[in-house]
């Protein structure tokens, strides 16, 4: 699970995530990239839910599909995600109640403006066009102000809210806060913050890794 905060308007999209991945017991497992950009499609792919699934889809979309632009990609995405999800669940022995949502944000090859879509496993990955505006997952207060300045505060609130939930229901958020800023000219990756326990989590990650490998 992850923090995902995004904002879209006709000429730009901002997609921000944390970087912490945890083991099944909630202990820090690794730091990872949770959103990526495909330059030749002018498209950002991100996801929540089953860790790593959206990254596998990004690799598939960027190297194994003959498509031109986000609308063309969107046409093929529901079928492609459905097939990949079945393989992914078997490979990682996921239970039937496991869920994931994949998001795609891109510059339209038709209009030159930002378009975005969500694909939820609970809805058979059907394409859901998203309106311009702000999206947050998990829930938090949508603040006003400079977006890159307020996103870290919003993620801190998300993490505080999740910390009050039972471990098996909690979304674990941590590491660094990375924002992707997409315009018609390209995409910039920007570190806009980090969590106060970043160093402690990094130490725990290497300690856990050493225990597993020794």
Identify the role of each PLM range:
Residues 92-93, 102:
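Accessory structured domains or lobes within enzymes
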